[in-house]
């Protein structure tokens, strides 16, 4: 389960390391991948990196990886959903609320008798994810906390918020 940011947009990045990791993971188990802010940015913004990212995307699909763009795949009593949030939710130094109805409008409806796993890159919105119905959420973005203090947790978030809860 990969909640995004397998790649960054730099001239020097060939995405080869990410592809090697993904290839190895596919040998172990099915892989489910939702985009983080780096993939979303590379996908929608026209830039010198976009063509390289599209090639990466094609290779990911060739590997058989399940890329979930605001989609759900269900397996009996288990469902895995991938969420992409607006890039505006990643502004540095600003706490941007997620629009109240965003999850209901964006994600497929889930059923109460299904254990709902959510791949959602930004942990800032953990409460909103739980309110939507996520039973278990995998996040990324904080890269383990930019600075972590034992017994306290993260010191600062990527949005430059002090002592983030998630």
Protein language model regions, located:
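Membrane-embedded segments
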Residues: 1-66
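Aromatic side chains
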Residues: 32-33, 38, 115, 129, ...
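Residue-level recognition of conserved structural "scaffold" positions that shape functional pockets
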Residues: 11, 43, 89, 147, ...
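Glycine-centered flexibility sites
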Residues: 4-5, 30, 36, 82, ...
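Conserved beta-sheet core of the metallophosphoesterase superfamily
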Residues: 23, 122-166
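Conserved catalytic scaffold of divalent metal-dependent phosphoesterases
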Residues: 39-138, 142-143
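Short charge-dense sequence patches
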Residues: 5-13, 118-122, 145-146
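Generic secondary-structure boundary signal with a strong preference for alpha-helix termini
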Residues: 16-17, 48, 76, 152, ...
């Amino acid at each position: 389960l990969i909640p995004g940011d397998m790649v960054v947009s730099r001239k020097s990045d060939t995405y080869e390391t990410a592809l090697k990791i993904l290839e190895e993971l596919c040998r172990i188990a099915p892989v489910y991948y939702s985009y983080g802010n780096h993939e979303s940015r590379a996908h929608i913004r026209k830039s010198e990196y976009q063509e390289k990212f599209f090639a990466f995307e094609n290779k990911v699909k060739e590997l058989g990886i399940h890329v979930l763009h605001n989609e759900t795949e269900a397996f009996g009593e288990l469902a895995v959903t991938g969420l992409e949030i607006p890039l505006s939710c990643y502004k540095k130094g600003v706490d941007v609320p997620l629009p109240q109805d965003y999850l209901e409008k964006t994600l497929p409806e889930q059923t109460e008798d299904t254990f709902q796993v959510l791949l959602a890159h930004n942990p800032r919105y953990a409460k909103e994810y739980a309110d939507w119905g996520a039973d278990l959420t995998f996040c990324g973005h904080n890269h383990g906390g930019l600075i972590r203090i034992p017994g306290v947790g993260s010191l600062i978030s990527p949005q430059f918020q002090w002592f983030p809860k998630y």
